[in-house]
Amino acid sequence: MAKLDIRTKSCLVTGAAGGIGGATAAVLGRERARLVLTDLDQRALDARADALRAAGAEVLVARAVDLTDAAAVSRFADEVHAAHGPMDVVLNIAGISVWGTIDRLTEDHWRRLLDVNLMGPVHVLSSFLPPMIEARRGGHVVNVASAAAIFGLPWHAAYSASKFGLRGVSEVLRFDLRRHRIGVSLVCPGAVATPLVEGLEVAGVDRAAPSIRKVEQQFLRHAVTPEVAAEAIVRGLRRRRYWVYTSRDIRLGHLAQRWFPWGYSLAMRLLNRQLTGAAAKAGVR
């Protein structure tokens, strides 16, 4: 497919109140895209929309929607389409994270992660893709997964399940939508310094413990800013890339997983040992 000219394109951005979603909306706004924004917090979303408009961006809609509610997403889509027509680009960025070993993760943890990280994007795609297809002018879908959709990271069983699921959806749509001239990008960020990290829940572990704080600081030392991640996302969108990485370490790790599986396996074992040791020092709640 030819490169995508983002100017004047209608772009839906979920998770737009802050973090990667907010930064991506800002980059798209500078590219003169027409923005439809959603998140859970209407007040934070309004503040983001005001800041974007003050910077010269065109914000068509900024509406709080619970993406886990299929009916609410459908109503939102109907309102957007009635007022502004089909979207040209859909960016599924909203997400949550919970870490924990399998014996500490609860049924609620699994449900919340799958509902938000997998079914949320599914609801968005189900409501916004049909009009995009019917418009017959092409388009693009961006699904933001995670490095946890590539690697078997320790304590990520439930989170990885949700993100591997989104990766699977993306892999199928990559080929299903091609005949409609709709491209698909799968974004796999590594460490990104966002509020998601600050509010991260680690099941059954005291996050305030020095050993856990040390692990978090090591994580953040490798983190890129949301702005760097957003630039990578929009660059991948413009070039219609399928695999989009926000940092070099994830790209290299993905190559190592495929071509040096013994090295990948060793790295995962060492990382698992490090986190297990940190949890043992912190104590289990």
Task: Put a short name on every predicted segment.
Residues 31-48:
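Conserved glycine-rich Rossmann-like NAD(P)H-binding loop of the short-chain dehydrogenase/reductase
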Residues 179-248:
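SDR active-site lid
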Residues 101-102, 106-114:
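Substrate-binding pocket helix/loop in short-chain dehydrogenase/reductase
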Residues 146:
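Residue(s) in the substrate-gating loop at a strand-loop-helix junction
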